[in-house]
Amino acid sequence: MAKTDLARRVYNHTWKLDPIIRSLLDTDFYKLLMLQMIWGLYPRVDATFSLINRTSSVRLADEIDEGELRAQLDHARTLRFSKKEMIWLAGNTFYGRKQIFQPEFLAWLHDFHLPEYELRRKDGQYELHFHGPWTHTTMWEIPALAIINELRSRAAMKNLGPFSLDVLYARAKAKMWSKVERLRQLPDLKISDFGTRRRHSFLWQRWCVEALKEGIGSAFTGTSNVLLAMDTDLEALGTNAHELPMVLAALAKTDDELRSAPYRVLQDWNRYYGGNLLIVLPDAFGTAAFLRNAPDWVADWTGFRPDSAPPIEGGERIIEWWKSKGKDPREKLLIFSDALDVDTIEETYRHFEGRVRMGFGWGTNLTNDFAGCAPQSIDGLKAISLVCKVTDANGHPAVKLSDNPQKATGDPKEVARYLRFFGNEERVEQLVRV
């Protein structure tokens, strides 16, 4: 792949529109895996996705021009999957499995396009919503976040000259490479790129992926970004997300259906996928509640992704649960992915080394760590905690509790109802940085 002069590319913004999203494959792999299941099992469910800025001190509508945001969103709606992309999806092997995507699904995907959006400004923030069939609105999550984060980066750098930009990217590259050198010291490390949604830019994410590929070799197991996986001959990685249990819980008509929603998701998932894709995401309504009510067969799955508890605490809780089910944790997999950086990766790796198989999904602090890199102080280069969550399913409010109350989303009355139902034990409030 040809190298790009990042500083020169940023400085030479003389074209009318520089599209941030240039392919529908510029998304996380698990969105396609989930989409196939949604298409197959829930084609008549409507779902609304909404932008949520958890760093409320950052006034996005004051930093990002509304016209530029609309232009980028409008451009993304013009995209279709190309013939090359469809051939790759049909013919490539994912997780050791050929034809993971059904021919009927790919035929439907051929004509796919992103649905309309609803955008307005309020109190210095953007209210951005995507209404419509779940099969379509789900695919807005990643491009919407990538667009807003990159527009914010562009706005922060627009007054920097070519030499200042050179210094910025030189320092960011050196900072990234110092992390690579530390990761080399972990002999059995398995780490992947999970940084699409909050990246500084697509080109910077590509540079980081190439740096990891060269710098740590086989310890770098792949990327969640489907386009980068295709272009760089890497594994496309990802399992499933909170939206699945959130939607099924919102659709529940009885207490039994609500209680069983997280496990019905796993049963649905098992109908479509197996092996290393059998990874449990337990924290949508609190990991403690999930483990307390989990059927025994959940312990047979390949592993867990503890996503919102502190990694060591969350990992220990799952290991103890496996042991209570008669399972050997050394044969199981824990994937850590919440707000990781080198310090937490090293600490977590050394804590669990030899006790459990581990994987690390490295996100924001891989693809958007520019702190201290600019020649002058620029607040707009600091990563923020921005998410796009399902907020409604067939007219019913959707809720996420999380193991960290700071990450809870949904109507406050519904959040309170879910807390009464699932319980509040072992949820620990932590500052959400990214």
UniProtKB/Swiss-Prot annotation:
<comment type="similarity">
    <text>Belongs to the NAPRTase family.</text>
</comment>
<keyword id="KW-0436">Ligase</keyword>
<keyword id="KW-0597">Phosphoprotein</keyword>
<dbReference type="GO" id="GO:0004516">
    <property type="term" value="F:nicotinate phosphoribosyltransferase activity"/>
</dbReference>
<protein>
    <recommendedName>
        <fullName>Nicotinate phosphoribosyltransferase</fullName>
        <ecNumber>6.3.4.21</ecNumber>
    </recommendedName>
</protein>
<feature type="modified residue" description="Phosphohistidine; by autocatalysis">
    <location>
        <position position="242"/>
    </location>
</feature>
<dbReference type="GO" id="GO:0034355">
    <property type="term" value="P:NAD biosynthetic process via the salvage pathway"/>
</dbReference>
<dbReference type="Pfam" id="PF17767">
    <property type="entry name" value="NAPRTase_N"/>
</dbReference>
<dbReference type="InterPro" id="IPR007229">
    <property type="entry name" value="Nic_PRibTrfase-Fam"/>
</dbReference>
<dbReference type="InterPro" id="IPR036068">
    <property type="entry name" value="Nicotinate_pribotase-like_C"/>
</dbReference>
<keyword id="KW-0662">Pyridine nucleotide biosynthesis</keyword>
<dbReference type="Pfam" id="PF04095">
    <property type="entry name" value="NAPRTase"/>
</dbReference>
<comment type="function">
    <text>Catalyzes the synthesis of beta-nicotinate D-ribonucleotide from nicotinate and 5-phospho-D-ribose 1-phosphate at the expense of ATP.</text>
</comment>
<dbReference type="GO" id="GO:0005829">
    <property type="term" value="C:cytosol"/>
</dbReference>
<dbReference type="InterPro" id="IPR040727">
    <property type="entry name" value="NAPRTase_N"/>
</dbReference>
<dbReference type="InterPro" id="IPR006406">
    <property type="entry name" value="Nic_PRibTrfase"/>
</dbReference>
<comment type="pathway">
    <text>Cofactor biosynthesis; NAD(+) biosynthesis; nicotinate D-ribonucleotide from nicotinate: step 1/1.</text>
</comment>
<dbReference type="InterPro" id="IPR041525">
    <property type="entry name" value="N/Namide_PRibTrfase"/>
</dbReference>
